[in-house]
A protein has these predicted regions:
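Helix-loop junctions and terminal segments of transmembrane helices
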Residues: 1-7, 182, 186-225, 229
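Membrane-interface helix-capping segments at transmembrane helix termini in multi-pass transporters
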Residues: 5-17, 28-54, 97-105
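Alpha-helical transmembrane segments of multi-pass membrane transporters/permeases
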Residues: 10, 51, 56, 66-91
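Alpha-helical transmembrane segments of multi-pass membrane proteins
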Residues: 24, 36, 40-66, 80, ...
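C-terminal transmembrane helix end/exit motif
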Residues: 35, 63-68, 72, 94, ...
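Interhelical loop/hinge segments that connect adjacent transmembrane helices in multipass membrane
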Residues: 47, 101, 117-161, 199, ...
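Hydrophobic alpha-helical transmembrane segments
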Residues: 47, 78-126, 186
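Interfacial/gating helices of multi-pass transporter permease domains
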Residues: 101-104, 141-145, 149, 167-187, ...
């Protein structure tokens, strides 16, 4: 949506304000549900889970904001900051301070906080956000686009969470080890495709209304199939 208004500052502000306001609303609703349901959750580190979900909501929104306004450098640097701070904090909390499992969760949360702060400062999000610019029609358009993607994301989450458990139970732990190693190779392939897909989707959005868009799309799709099926 931001790609369509890349040259329209007011349009960008309206979209960013609407999305971030919706993130606040979603986070409040989620935390209210968590407060009600927390007595039924026996996990020792359930509060870290609640915080992590809220941080993920805002981090995802800010990452897409960076891509939408063409700040690919900030997008890349934020990923580096997230990974680096996570590793350093894990070493500090687990190896040095001996916090154990709690240190791992704390490191994850703090690394996301650091990344979010970097994104807010480097992208100057404050200049794009204003409560009065919240637009229900923008949210409806985004929801209309997003809802069909939910089953797909849930399916991938179920597969990712259950495949190793099923392999271990049905075939055995040794087979699960082989399966995990094999997944590393496919994971590398998927990572390569994801890098290509980031630039590809942006190019499609930017050139969709041009006269030679059909030729551009056809050639790119053909080349993509040749590359990833060879």
């Amino acid at each position: 949506f931001l790609l369509d208004v890349r040259d329209n500052k007011e349009g960008q502000k309206k979209i960013v304000s609407s999305v971030l306001s919706m993130c606040f609303i979603q986070s409040i609703i989620y935390l209210l549900f968590f407060i009600v349901a927390q007595n039924f959750i026996t996990a020792e580190y359930k509060y870290y889970l609640a915080i992590d979900v809220v941080l993920n909501v805002f981090l995802s929104a800010l990452l897409q904001f960076a891509r939408g306004i063409g700040k690919t450098t900030n997008y890349t640097v934020s990923s580096f900051i997230s990974a680096t701070s996570n590793i350093c904090l894990n070493v500090l909390f687990i190896a040095v301070l001996r916090f154990g499992a709690e240190g791992m969760f704390l490191a994850t949360v703090l690394s996301k906080v650091v990344t979010i702060l970097y994104m807010i400062i480097s992208l100057k999000v404050v200049r794009y956000y204003a409560v009065h610019l919240f637009d229900k029609s923008v949210i409806k358009q985004i929801a209309k686009y997003s809802f069909p993607l939910i089953p797909n994301q849930l399916s991938w989450w179920v597969v990712g969470a259950s495949d190793r458990v099923i392999v271990s139970k049905v075939i055995g732990v040794a087979a699960n080890g082989v399966y995990s190693i094999a997944n590393k190779f496919s994971g590398l392939f998927v990572s390569f495709y994801n890098i290509f897909n980031l630039s590809w989707t942006e190019s499609v959005s930017l050139h969709l209304d041009e006269e030679d868009s059909e030729k551009f799309l056809t050639e790119t799709i053909n080349d993509m199939f040749k590359l990833f099926t060879c």
